[in-house]
Every structure is written in structure tokens, then in C-alpha cells.
Amino acid sequence: MGSIIESCAKAADKVRDICPLVHCITNYVTVNDVANCILAIGASPIMADDIAEAADITSISKALVINMGTLNARTVESMVAAGKKANELGVPVVFDPVGAGASNFRNETAKRILENVKISILRGNLSEMSYLAGLEVSTKGVDTSEADETVSYTHLRAHETGRNL
């Protein structure tokens, strides 16, 4: 366990030492929290979701975060352009497909991003991940269904007890 903690501490120190610029195309509900969290770990956030600058900002960034929380047609173009630029430059891309499975627009956007951008980290709740895996889901946005919570709890308990499902 000590080696994991030491590795995390070294990684955190490195982030503080280099203060990387993190380009976020994120939702307006959490934009302030996202910026403050990035600042708290020693990085520097920039929120740029206009197509006129998305690729340019990505080209000077050390990471790109794409979040579909407050999705609109304008930002989809920026997400894809920034993602392609990040891939071209070897910049890691974090993708949060918020609400995937909830609407055709979100489903098509998630599919488009996954087809056009190499994702480094894919994050989301169980409903979103299940939808992306092609499973039947009842997505309600950022919330998971009761069945999803049951499955999540079951997997957690299995992990805690050392059992495989």
C-alpha cells in the first residue's frame, strides 16, 4: 500500500512543480468547482469552448477535459476539434459522457467523440458506461437507476470479499 501512496504523492508533487495548463470544455453547472479543483492540485485551468479557439488552446495545454453535462451543438464541434488536436500532439484526453443513454443527441455526440478522439480516461456513472458498452440502461442524466446502484453495490461487495462476479 505504501508504494501506491508514495507514487500518488510523487505525481502530485510533479503536478505542482510543472503547473500544467488543463483545457476544459465542461458544463456550466460545475465550471467553477472544476476550475477550483484543478487549481487546488496545482494545475492551471482554462475554459475555452468556442470553435474559434478550442484547438489553439488545446495546443498549449497539457491535458484536455471534455464533459457533456450542458451539451449543445456549438460545443460538440469544439469538443471534436480540441480532441483531434490533443491526439495529434499527444495530450491526454479525459472524457465524461454525462447523460449518455438519455437522449439521441447525447448518444450521437458520445459516439462521435469516441469514434474521432482517442480517449485516455473515460469516466462516468454506471448507466453511462453501460450505455457505451451497448447494454440496456435507464439513464436519467447524471443519476443512475436503482438497478444500477444495486449492481454497483454488488460489485463493490464482491471486490471487498475477494469474489469475482
Report the location of each language-model feature:
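Phosphate- and divalent-cation-binding pockets in alpha/beta enzyme and binding domains
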Residues: D33, Y131-L132, N164
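Single conserved hydrophobic/aromatic residue that forms the stacking wall/gate
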Residues: H155-A158, G162-L165
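Glycine-rich phosphate/dinucleotide-binding loop and adjoining beta-alpha-beta core of small-molecule
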Residues: A55-R157
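Conserved N-terminal subdomain of the carbohydrate kinase-like
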Residues: G2-F95
